[in-house]
């Protein structure tokens, strides 16, 4: 079938089961082919092909609300809602988003990117439906990994208490990104093998009612003994105890089983949970046989061999450099413990986990718990290393402030994917952490210019005993600079001059250092001499150097691959104002006050005006404005 001809999901409503199976095969071939060129979340989407088709067959989108948790498994939904022709642009600049996008389609009723939000959103939609007196079905689809998130469990508790009408689809593939962990995962494992509880209960009730004279009384007695029956038939009965009608387990690749259970769910009053078992990566053997999460989300790959297309050469990956440096130090410091919220592969912690299995904790999608777990460890003299993406640290803000920084505990936050991340777009750009961290008392915040300085910062962080410390670092590979064999501490709060100059000053750090140096080279050819400072400590700043620079009366330009509001440039302005440099010329470049969508990092930087050429032009505009201090 030519999938680009699909304009509306109603097309699946008239298909026979054999036709639906053929459509599934066509979609899998399409995804494998398209994603081999663009990259994307291949594993999750290959696993939900039949489930997505069945949902669109039984429900009437967009009237009925299909809400995709996390959203990376929405590609099949996009195909069935008329967007197959755009898949060549998937996750590309100005192209199709890799997540549900309300501006893209009326069928995308909720935008996601972070996990565990679907149930709360669904409940809000269901309450609005009931208050307005409409009759649409509300259907959140949540994975077993996302169900480990505290927000999802909070919503389950509230939905069950309110007896809200909705149909929750639990897509259980035994993995989130990496293999799942935790007691809830073990409960689901028992449910997978327990048989269809709801069907057995209903059949028993019908059988008892057929017994002459006493059947009705026996059925009533059985209903009163429902709890005993549940515990006999199903190990755990977790969802029934929360107030849900539990259906399953259902074969997520069998249309008859799926459609039968979805039809039954539509008849049930109150919240229903349909437990669907799927195989992540189904239909493409490299993804289907993946046990660690390599094929969860990928770059381009070769279909025939299942090998990834190599990107341009560079240094070691930043995640790998940080984790391996921690591992190296941990060999001589038994206090070091690693923690990750469900990202052991992305954070390159496999080696640490293999060498120190009793000192490595993957807590699942539980950023708040991960942070306070680290705080608890620190109270007992341990040195917790929390590997967490910038975008996910947002979810643990109160714990950072209240549990770690307020108590001045020695926690090392390794903030991965800081800055623009590219193809994952606005839900994953790591551009807010400076603004939400720099004002928190007791916290040290730093970012290295290259991987050699990065390894020394890791060492500095793990040697630091005066409170919490955080190191930001970008996605991808380093610059390929030589690495010192011996690790050394960097004095806290010190900057360094990378290039001297007499006409203007650039203050920057991290990934924008190379941009500043390139701009300085361009300006030198025009006779403009620019000093470039590596402002590697964002907090505390190098106040002695900052005084010296302000006393020089040179115009200052700050550059950051982060939001301007409340960022590093703002801290420099505040310092100048607070210390009486009221005539200082200070301008800022960074991320504007809007969410940055998907595209390559270079394309996004060009769009927002953050390149070496833009920096050189900006320096030229502030040169005539040099003024003396008041």
UniProtKB/Swiss-Prot annotation:
SMART domains: Transket_pyr. One of its GO terms (cellular component) is cytosol. Thiamine diphosphate binds at residues 72, 113-115, 145-146, 173, 284, 367. One of its GO terms (molecular function) is thiamine pyrophosphate binding. Keywords: Isoprene biosynthesis, Magnesium, Metal-binding, Thiamine biosynthesis, Thiamine pyrophosphate, Transferase. Its EC number is 2.2.1.7. Binds 1 Mg(2+) ion per subunit. Binds 1 thiamine pyrophosphate per subunit. Its cofactor is Mg(2+); thiamine diphosphate. SUPFAM superfamilies: Thiamin diphosphate-binding fold (THDP-binding) (SSF52518), TK C-terminal domain-like (SSF52922). Mg(2+) binds at residues 144, 173. It comes from the Bacteria. One of its GO terms (biological process) is isopentenyl diphosphate biosynthetic process, methylerythritol 4-phosphate pathway. Pathway: Metabolic intermediate biosynthesis; 1-deoxy-D-xylulose 5-phosphate biosynthesis; 1-deoxy-D-xylulose 5-phosphate from D-glyceraldehyde 3-phosphate and pyruvate: step 1/1. It catalyses: D-glyceraldehyde 3-phosphate + pyruvate + H(+) = 1-deoxy-D-xylulose 5-phosphate + CO2. Homodimer. Catalyzes the acyloin condensation reaction between C atoms 2 and 3 of pyruvate and glyceraldehyde 3-phosphate to yield 1-deoxy-D-xylulose-5-phosphate (DXP). Belongs to the transketolase family. DXPS subfamily. This is 1-deoxy-D-xylulose-5-phosphate synthase. It comes from Geobacillus thermodenitrificans (strain NG80-2). The lineage of its organism: Bacteria, Bacillati, Bacillota, Bacilli, Bacillales. The gene is dxs.
């Amino acid at each position: 079938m030519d999938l680009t001809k699909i304009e509306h999901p109603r097309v699946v409503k008239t298909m026979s089961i054999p036709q639906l199976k053929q459509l599934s095969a066509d979609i899998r071939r399409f995804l494998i082919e398209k994603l081999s060129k663009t990259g994307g979340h291949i594993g999750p989407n290959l696993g939900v092909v039949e489930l997505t088709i069945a949902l669109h067959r039984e429900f009437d989108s967009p009237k009925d609300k299909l809400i995709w948790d996390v959203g990376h498994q929405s590609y099949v939904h996009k195909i069935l809602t008329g967007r197959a022709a755009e898949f060549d642009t998937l996750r590309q600049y100005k192209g199709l988003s890799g997540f549900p996008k309300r501006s893209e389609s009326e069928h995308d009723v909720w935008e996601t990117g972070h996990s565990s939000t679907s149930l709360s959103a669904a409940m809000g939609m269901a309450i609005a439906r009931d208050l307005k007196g409409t009759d649409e079905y509300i259907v959140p689809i949540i994975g077993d990994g996302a169900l480990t998130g505290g927000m999802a469990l909070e919503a389950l508790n509230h939905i069950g208490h309110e007896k809200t009408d909705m149909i929750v689809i639990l897509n259980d593939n035994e993995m989130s990104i990496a293999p799942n962990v935790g007691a809830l995962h073990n409960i689901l494992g028992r449910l997978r093998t327990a048989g269809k509880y709801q069907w057995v209960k209903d059949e028993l009730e019908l059988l008892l009612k057929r017994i002459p004279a006493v059947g009705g009384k026996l059925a009533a007695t059985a209903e009163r003994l429902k709890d005993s029956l549940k515990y006999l038939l199903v190990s755990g009965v977790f969802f029934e105890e929360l107030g849900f009608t539990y259906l399953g387990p259902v074969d997520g690749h069998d249309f008859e089983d799926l459609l039968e259970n979805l039809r039954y769910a539509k008849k049930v009053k109150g919240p229903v949970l349909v437990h669907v078992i799927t195989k992540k990566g189904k239909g493409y053997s490299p993804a289907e046989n993946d046990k660690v999460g390599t094929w969860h989300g990928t770059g381009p790959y070769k279909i025939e061999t299942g090998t990834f297309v190599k990107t341009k050469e560079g240094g070691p990956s930043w995640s790998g450099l940080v984790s391996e440096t921690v591992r190296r130090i941990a060999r001589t410091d038994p206090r070091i413990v690693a923690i990750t919220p469900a990202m052991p592969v992305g954070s390159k912690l496999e080696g640490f986990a293999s060498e120190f299995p009793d000192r490595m904790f993957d807590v699942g999608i539980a950023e708040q718990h991960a942070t306070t777990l680290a705080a608890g460890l620190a109270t007992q003299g341990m040195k917790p290393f929390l590997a967490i993406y910038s975008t996910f640290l947002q979810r643990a803000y109160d714990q950072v402030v209240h549990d770690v920084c307020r108590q001045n505990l020695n926690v090392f936050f390794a903030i991965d994917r800081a800055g623009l991340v590219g193809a994952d777009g606005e839900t994953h750009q790591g551009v807010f952490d400076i603004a939400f961290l720099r004002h928190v008392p007791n916290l040290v915040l730093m970012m290295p210019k290259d991987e050699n300085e990065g390894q020394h910062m890791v060492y500095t962080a793990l040697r630091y005993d005066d409170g919490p410390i955080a190191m930001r670092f970008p996605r991808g590979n380093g610059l390929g600079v030589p690495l010192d064999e011996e690790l050394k501490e960097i004095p806290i709060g010190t900057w360094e001059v990378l290039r001297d100059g007499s006409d203007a000053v650039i203050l920057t750090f991290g990934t924008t250092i190379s941009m500043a140096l390139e701009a300085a080279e361009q300006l030198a050819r025009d006779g403009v001499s620019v000093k470039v400072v590596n402002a590697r400590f964002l907090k505390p700043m190098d106040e002695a150097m900052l005084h010296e620079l302000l006393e020089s009366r040179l115009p200052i330009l700050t550059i950051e691959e982060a939001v301007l509001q409340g960022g590093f440039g703002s801290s420099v302005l505040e310092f100048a104002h607070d210390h009486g440099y009221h005539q200082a010329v200070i301008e800022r470049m960074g991320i504007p006050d809007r969410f940055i969508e998907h595209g390559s990092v270079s394309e996004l930087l060009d769009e927002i005006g953050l390149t070496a050429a833009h920096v050189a032009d900006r320096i030229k505009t502030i040169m005539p404005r040099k003024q003396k201090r008041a």
